[in-house]
């Protein structure tokens, strides 16, 4: 809303009198705010922590199993329980971030993970290692919730998709670093190699703790505390103009229930949205729009994980070994290639989100994942039914794994976090996003802990056929339930939701709504939704 009004007011001033040749020049693209980008990068450093753990465990679990003499079940539990433990962090993060602020919740996430990484690196045995993963999991849960919330709240509307995709970018960067760490420390003695792999994960947490000193607080959180003066100063730094900053502030004040005539640096804020009433509005008595938002957010998180991306990433060395790559060094190198592909395609996605839109990328991504999972299942089934190595089937397995992570990274990976963090109303955002993270981590933990048992029960090819079938259901859900949010302000989201398959009508209304530019009109530049 704010960004459109800035553009509309500028255009109005040009066309009120005569039409000059310059008026017909192509409209300039909005400037990218470098300070907002820097803030988003610092906040999203928390996402490296999860990515590193996913990547490093794919190789470290083999060393851990050999060193501590663990069974496949114990390794599955070790790999998957961090996701379950992160539920504690994500559940606490909503209330914590509303209490101490988004900025210091980012710091808390880094501190907790730092302690957990050190405990894992120093673990003398399985029980101590599990305790370290418990602590690290809480830190990951905090980071997964707060990074997208902070980024979406500090981002200008026209670059929100680009900036809010940063958490997934850093998850992928963390995965790549984890794979590289596996390869770098694989030459060490077994009892040292995995400890170095896990312990090095503490380094990003240190960088985060130092870098956060340069981050401002979220302007939307500041408004919710009644600190309008501080919020205005942050918006001035993260907007492309003073006028845009003022319009963004007006939108946030309206969403927070603060009367427009209140302009003091510190004002009182209505308290009805705090505590238990937030959960009442979100779960017990939601409006049709909030119910639709909740279904969409939880659904996209559910399908992001249930389609098996963690099985592909976490167990890629085993998949390549099953396909016929016998050399452990070659297996790790192939796994590093997976990390590079994920990172490259997530960077491509960041530049497409605000140009192409969420829905086209999401549906294309899911279609590619379905095809690659089906082909991977077919190739692994063929390999399973032959005693000798079949070169073309091995090549197809490697190619389909790379295709799968590429299609995931260009759509479903980043859009899940962008979409779920931008659609909730301001007063419900922290708790809403924490619910999405909880669903995401539960399903991720289930997939991680059951993959080895699943492929033993229905064959490894059958497991990927199952994921492909679930992918078809995901595509139908995305097509029918998720409106396009590109170009809409955070304060406009409720207009799009609540109509389910008729969301296009609401989107068309927002696009065609006329703005009154008449002289002396008190509501100049305002959009009326009645």
Give the predicted meaning of each segment.
Residues 2-236, 247, 260-530:
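Transmembrane-helix signature of 12-pass secondary carriers
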Residues 239-242:
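Short helix/loop segments within enzyme catalytic domains
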Residues 248-255:
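Short amphipathic alpha-helical segments embedded in low-complexity Lys/Glu-rich regions
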């Amino acid at each position: 809303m704010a960004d459109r009004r800035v553009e509309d007011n500028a255009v109005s001033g040009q066309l009120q009198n005569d039409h000059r040749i310059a008026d017909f020049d192509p409209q300039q693209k909005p400037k990218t705010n470098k300070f907002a980008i820097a803030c988003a990068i610092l906040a999203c450093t928390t996402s490296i922590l999860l990515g590193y753990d996913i990547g490093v465990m794919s190789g470290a679990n083999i060393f851990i199993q050999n060193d501590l003499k663990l069974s496949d079940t114990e390794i599955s539990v070790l790999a998957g329980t961090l996701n379950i433990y992160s539920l504690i962090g994500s559940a606490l993060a909503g209330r914590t971030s509303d209490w101490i602020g988004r900025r210091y919740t980012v710091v808390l996430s880094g501190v907790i993970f730092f302690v957990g990484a050190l405990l894992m690196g120093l673990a003398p045995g399985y029980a101590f290692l599990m305790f370290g993963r418990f602590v690290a999991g809480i830190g990951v849960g905090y980071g997964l919730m707060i990074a997208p919330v902070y980024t979406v709240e500090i981002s200008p509307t026209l670059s929100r998709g680009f900036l809010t995709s940063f958490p997934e970018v850093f998850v992928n960067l963390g995965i790549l670093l984890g794979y590289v760490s596996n390869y770098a420390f694989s030459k060490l003695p077994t009892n040292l190699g995995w400890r170095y792999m896990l312990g090095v994960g503490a380094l990003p947490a240190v960088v985060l703790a130092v870098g956060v000193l340069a981050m401002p607080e979220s302007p939307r959180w500041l408004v919710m505390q009644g600190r309008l003066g501080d919020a205005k100063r942050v918006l001035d730094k993260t907007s492309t103009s003073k006028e845009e900053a003022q319009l963004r502030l007006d939108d946030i004040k309206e969403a927070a229930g603060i009367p427009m005539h209140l302009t003091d640096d510190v004002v009182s804020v209505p308290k009805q949205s705090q505590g238990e009433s937030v959960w009442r509005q979100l779960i017990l008595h939601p409006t049709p729009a909030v119910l639709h938002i909740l279904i969409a957010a939880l659904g996209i998180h559910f399908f992001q994980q249930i389609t098996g991306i963690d099985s592909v990433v976490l167990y890629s060395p085993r998949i390549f070994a099953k396909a016929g790559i016998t050399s452990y060094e070659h297996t790790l190198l192939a796994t590093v290639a997976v990390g590079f592909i994920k990172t490259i395609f997530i960077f491509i996605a960041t530049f497409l989100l605000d140009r192409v839109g969420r829905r086209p990328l999401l549906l294309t991504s899911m279609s590619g994942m379905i095809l690659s999972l089906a082909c991977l299942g077919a190739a692994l089934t063929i390999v399973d039914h032959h005693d000798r190595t079949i070169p073309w089937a091995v090549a197809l397995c490697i190619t389909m794994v790379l295709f799968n992570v590429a299609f995931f990274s260009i759509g479903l990976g980043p859009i899940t976090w962008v979409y779920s963090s931008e659609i909730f109303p301001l007063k419900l955002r922290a708790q809403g996003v924490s619910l999405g993270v909880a669903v995401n981590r539960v399903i991720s933990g289930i997939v991680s802990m059951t993959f080895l048992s699943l492929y033993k029960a229905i064959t490894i090819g059958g497991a990927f056929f199952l994921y492909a079938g679930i992918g078809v259901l995901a595509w139908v859900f995305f097509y029918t339930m998720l409106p396009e949010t590109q170009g809409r302000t955070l304060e406009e989201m409720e207009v799009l939701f609540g109509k389910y398959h008729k969301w296009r009508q609401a989107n068309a209304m927002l696009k065609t709504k006329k703005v009154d530019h008449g002289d002396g009109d008190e509501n100049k530049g305002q959009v009326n939704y009645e």
